[in-house]
Amino acid sequence: AISPRECLIAKLILQGGKRANEVLTLHTQNIDWQRRKIIFEQSKTKGTRKATVITYPQSVMDKLKAYLGDRSGLVFITRTGKPIMMTRLAHMFEKAGKVAGIPFKVTPHVLRASTVTYLKQQGFQDTDIMKVTGHSSAAMVCAYDKTSQESNATEKVQLVS
């Protein structure tokens, strides 16, 4: 079975197309309970920092609050209070994928790509998606987009008759 903690990690990654490391390094001070927003800090190369702000459904915020209790600091920790390592997270996702009967290896990165693909299918522009995922260019967004070549604007618009 998938633990409530693992489920929350997956939901935070999926809603915002977040990198696993952004979720694992999340601190309670970056959560705005009133506005249902979480600020994710991105460590970029060359030492620059960038942040993305993601709005979550109230149901997710309620589960997150219940998970945290009155604890502060790192949001996701082990039973012994240590940070969750990326290798551990990868193992949790792989196990969850097998339990769910998914025929390919499930990783946090798969969820990130799924977010981009879904937002593209819903008609969001690359610039809107970049604000969510923190991608630095439209080219990177396109690299994550897994929609088929056949699925394009000509399915929705008839320019000629």
Q: PLM features: what roles do these ranges have?
A:
Residues 90-131:
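Short, basic (Lys/Arg/His-rich) helix/loop patches that form interaction surfaces
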Residues 45-65, 73-94:
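C-terminal catalytic core of Y-nucleophile DNA break-rejoin enzymes
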Residues 13, 24, 130:
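The alpha-helix within a helix-turn-helix
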Residues 25-66, 139:
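Conserved tyrosine-mediated DNA breakage-rejoining catalytic core shared by Y-recombinases
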Residues 1-20, 150:
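Basic, Lys/Arg- and aromatic-enriched nucleic-acid-binding interface segment
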Residues 44-46, 133-158:
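Catalytic-site neighborhood detector that most strongly recognizes the C-terminal catalytic loop/helix
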